[in-house]
């Protein structure tokens, strides 16, 4: 079955932003965009499909690109997950309302073990995914992010910024260095342009966004299980606002890179 980019849709401004971000990814891969709206009951499907199809057809005409409208009935989280599998989605882009809906977002993205989510709150801000920020620590599971960076670079020829916390513990420092070496081996082999930046571990979330304020990345990659912490621990007002502008790609440790033409680790 042909792969697609999935956009869970709710007729909000944020959903429209997600559609634009999805198009940036889809137009290079030539894969269709599927807009999915979930309704409570079967009897509502036909009515809402008419409305969603208007949006899909308008976007398709304006961009000369294939956009499909899909309306399903059922539990929101289960239905999004089931359709993602059914439609062979390899990537999903979803609009969020930030901290206000973080629990809802977590319920969706944690189900998708093999499908990463890009979460957006704003229009495309800096550019077309040609700057990628990858925060790392001593967790080996985070290496899945480097493989997704490799894939995104194949599409956009991106510059990558690895940001890590300076730690005193020798064991943790060794693990961080091992992760950096792992990334270096991948990026150098594929001639991916990258920089490595260290920040103070105290207030890491804010220090990370301070760096991103300077480099202006088009997307930042977090492990799904660290997404909530990475957002809720931001304290500085300027960084709270910045976090709304930079799309977040949530990656699970078991993401199936093989189906994207990458490799396992």
Where are these regions (language model features)?
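Small/aliphatic-rich secondary-structure junction motif
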Residues: 1-46, 131-175, 179-195, 217-219, ...
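CheY-like receiver
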Residues: 25, 79-83, 207, 211
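Short, aromatic/basic amphipathic alpha-helical patches
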Residues: 49-59, 175-187, 211, 232-241
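A short helix-to-beta-strand connector/capping loop
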Residues: 61-68, 189-195
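Short, flexible loop segments at the rims of nucleotide/cofactor-binding pockets, characterized by
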Residues: 68-72, 138, 195-200, 227
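Charged docking surfaces used in two-component/phosphorelay signaling
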Residues: 71-79, 201-205
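Gly/Ser-rich helix-loop-strand patches that form or flank binding pockets
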Residues: 79-126, 214, 218-265
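A short, acidic, amphipathic alpha-helical segment used as a generic capping/interface helix at domain edges
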Residues: 184, 201-213
